[in-house]
Amino acid sequence: MKLLKNKKVTFVALLAILAVLSTQSVSAMHIMEGYLPLFWCIFWFAVFLPFFVVGLMRIKKIVAEDPNSKTMLALSGAFIFILSSLKIPSVTGSSSHPTGVGLGTAMFGPSVISVLGTICLLFQALLLAHGGLTTLGANAFSMAVVGPFVGYFVYKFAKSIKLSTPVSIFICAVIADLATYATTSIQLGLVFPDANSGFVGSALKFMGVFLTTQIPIAIVEGLLTVVLYNLISENVKERAGLFK
């Protein structure tokens, strides 16, 4: 009981580290409404949509096989929503934030997160002015597709070389977070190429700006994800098998 209490305290403390850094006075990291030309809005929606459809099919199958999985799906979605809603200033007056996709990715795979992450992004755009509707496809592709798929690949690789589940989940969460920001940097670089160095130079500049704050954020997110995994595996033991 004491160990459980300590882990709950650790979870709250790590979440507080992120929350205390958050601010409402800066623009969000998600690409804002009206920031992308119409062509790129349509393009990213078209690229993202197949992943969303596959994700819906995957969720339907999971729930049909195990109706009790709805609880863990809801928990994964809530974790994404809470963490990705935090706004943390970066060096330019823009902001960075955790993504929260690592936990659900490890439990259900990346396809499911393409749906859960998109739902979170939609609510954030409507309720928090975080991101936008026209840029939903671009934001979903980076945070709900690329981040989870890269994180899942790394998670499976870590498990294949016999790393422990907590370590594998930590790596998954960190890499998924960083992959999301790398993708967003590429998206912005395509739209706003540098006058001298072109797309590559612009994308690298965006990455440099975001990574200044994103690396420590990703590490804290990884630790937070591991603590939540430990709470799940110790208190809902029948769900521990989800982390294969």
UniProtKB/Swiss-Prot annotation:
It is a multi-pass membrane protein. The keyword Ligase does not apply. It is found in: Cell membrane. Its main location: membrane. Keywords: Cell membrane, Cobalamin biosynthesis, Cobalt, Cobalt transport, Ion transport, Membrane, Signal, Transmembrane, Transmembrane helix, Transport. Pfam families: CbiM (PF01891). InterPro entries: CbiM, CbiM/NikMN. One of its GO terms (cellular component) is ATP-binding cassette (ABC) transporter complex. The keyword Ion transport applies. GO terms for molecular function: cobalt ion transmembrane transporter activity. Belongs to the CbiM family. Forms an energy-coupling factor (ECF) transporter complex composed of an ATP-binding protein (A component, CbiO), a transmembrane protein (T component, CbiQ) and 2 possible substrate-capture proteins (S components, CbiM and CbiN) of unknown stoichimetry. This is Cobalt transport protein CbiM.
